[in-house]
């Protein structure tokens, strides 16, 4: 019921806030710097809309879990993916695995969907192998293609359609992947990694 209300608000309220559309960091957001050998990527995270994904990401980051990991899946004009300690896309687990079965049954934690977050260019989202299988892997949307003319106005808010002019992957929207952050500086680094 709340999701339906939020969707209606996102679609009809011209004052609806889409946090990805601003580089300003709100009080209820977190900022993280991802350091790579190509440069730094600064992201803001959205715990209000994706509390599990943000807590998992921040805890792993603070614990050094992500240190030295490769971007093991790199597809130019699509996305770059990391977070797997095995480096091949088959590894990684959530901070709750084996500790809290109410959050991670053993297969990963649940998807979090918000009609205020989308797979826009620069969006961070959890990579998974199906519903509710989120572990430690995440991707950054890198696609530069303008999708705005291809998006149905009954499914995407006008401000988001406008934002998709800059690229992203709207085919990943709809709740299958938890969007939990947005690059606010260093998108050029994301492009360097993708190339």
Set out the residue ranges of the language-model regions.
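Cyclophilin-like peptidyl-prolyl cis-trans isomerases
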Residues: 1-195
């Amino acid at each position: 019921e709340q999701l339906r209300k939020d969707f209606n608000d996102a679609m009809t309220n011209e004052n609806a806030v889409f946090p990805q559309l601003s580089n300003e960091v709100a009080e209820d957001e977190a900022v993280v710097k991802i350091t790579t050998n190509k440069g730094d990527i600064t992201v803001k995270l959205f715990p209000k809309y994706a509390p599990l994904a943000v807590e998992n990401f921040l805890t792993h980051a603070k614990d050094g879990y992500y240190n030295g990991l490769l971007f093991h899946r790199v597809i130019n004009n699509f996305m770059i993916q990391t977070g797997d300690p095995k480096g091949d896309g088959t590894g990684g687990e959530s901070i709750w695995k084996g500790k809290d079965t109410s959050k991670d049954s053993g297969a990963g934690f649940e998807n979090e969907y918000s009609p205020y977050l989308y797979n826009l260019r620069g969006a961070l989202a959890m990579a998974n192998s199906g519903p509710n299988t989120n572990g430690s892997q995440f991707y950054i949307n890198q696609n530069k293609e303008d999708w705005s003319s291809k998006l149905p106005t009954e499914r995407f808010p006008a401000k988001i359609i406008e934002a998709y002019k800059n690229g992203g992957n709207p085919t990943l929207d709809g709740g299958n992947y938890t969007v939990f952050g947005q690059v606010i500086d260093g998108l050029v680094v994301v492009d360097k990694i993708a190339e």
